[in-house]
């Protein structure tokens, strides 16, 4: 895109800051439901609320013409990818420190770079391989204390990053198929029933931590709030990207990690330690190295809430 005026860029970056901060607020709300309701059920209810809200928005903006489903198999792939990412991320933030889960999920652009070579046939630059090595060194540093304390649950955010990487890859293949709001609606329409099925199956076979019992009104309200913060956050990020460009907005993704660390400390008494900070710094460094190697850069996504 052509260079935007400085005042417009400043406004766009402030709006992006608000968008990424809202995503972290939603993540903190999800974490506050740990022990109240299983993460798969929370993710299913959140996406069903999201689908209803987006349906209303599509109807108001595009009318009946907005209810289309281009390239159904590709939409199924997008929905399955975001369903996996959301459920794994919610499981992760409920089990481990919010900042650690957020940092590990930020490896999704690194995984996307790998998938772009395997799936889209794009050349992966040498700098991207260096970024991959640095970021995954950071993941190992962050995972080690969490793995010792939690076991396999510590790998949930990595599953979320894998799902987001597939979503970004599918999004690039489906670019231009329909307006952005319509594409968000089709995404939610596929993810919502998939998450309902997953939550039901895990409730039957997943053990005590996955059993869906009676939910309180607070849980329903919190799930609705997460749907609102996520949809609003992604809309603000998209607006900022269209007005300032992905190259300027993408590095601001890491504001989300700073906000997550602050909320984790203030809300859940999760004071960051030196080891986690070192690992998170490596992940951010790898992400920034990847961003510098990309021309054009991938649009920012944030966490999959």
Give a label for each model feature:
Residues 2-3, 51-70, 137-149, 192-218, ...:
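Membrane-interface helix-cap regions at the ends of transmembrane helices
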Residues 11-19, 58, 64-88, 152-160, ...:
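Loop-to-transmembrane-helix transition segments
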Residues 12, 36-84, 163-167, 186-205, ...:
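Transmembrane alpha-helices of multi-pass small-molecule transport proteins
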Residues 31, 39-40, 54, 149-208, ...:
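Transmembrane alpha-helical segments that form core, pore/gating elements
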Residues 41-44, 48, 91-121, 246-263:
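Specific alpha-helical transmembrane segments that line the substrate/conduction pathway
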Residues 105, 121-141, 147, 151-156, ...:
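Loop-to-transmembrane alpha-helix entry segments
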């Amino acid at each position: 895109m052509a260079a935007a005026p400085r005042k417009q860029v400043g406004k766009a970056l402030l709006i992006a800051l608000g968008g990424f901060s809202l995503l972290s607020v939603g993540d903190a709300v999800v974490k506050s439901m740990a022990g109240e309701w299983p993460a798969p059920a929370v993710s299913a209810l959140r996406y069903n609320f999201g689908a209803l809200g987006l349906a209303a928005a599509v109807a108001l903006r595009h009318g009946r013409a907005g209810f289309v489903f281009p390239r159904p198999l590709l939409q199924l792939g997008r929905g399955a990818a975001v369903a996996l990412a959301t459920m794994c991320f919610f499981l992760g933030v409920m089990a481990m420190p919010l900042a650690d889960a957020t940092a590990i999920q930020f490896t999704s652009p690194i995984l996307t770079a790998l998938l772009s070579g395997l799936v889209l046939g794009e050349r992966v630059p040498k700098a991207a391989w260096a970024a991959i090595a640095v970021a995954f060194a950071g993941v190992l540093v962050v995972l080690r204390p969490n793995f010792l304390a939690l076991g396999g649950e510590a790998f949930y955010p990595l599953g979320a990053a894998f799902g987001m990487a597939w979503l970004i890859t599918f999004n690039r293949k489906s670019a231009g198929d329909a307006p952005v709001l319509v594409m968000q609606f089709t995404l939610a329409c596929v993810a919502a029933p998939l998450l309902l099925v997953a939550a039901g199956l895990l409730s039957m076979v997943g053990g005590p931590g996955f059993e869906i019992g009676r939910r309180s009104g607070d849980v329903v309200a919190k799930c609705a709030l997460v749907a609102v913060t996520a949809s609003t956050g992604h809309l603000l990020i998209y607006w900022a990207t269209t007005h300032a460009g992905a190259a300027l907005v993408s590095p601001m993704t890491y504001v989300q990690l700073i906000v997550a660390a602050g909320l984790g400390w203030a809300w859940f008494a999760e004071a960051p330690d030196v080891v986690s900070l070192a690992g998170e710094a490596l992940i951010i460094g790898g992400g920034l190295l990847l961003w510098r190697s990309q021309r054009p850069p991938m649009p920012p996504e944030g966490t999959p809430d």
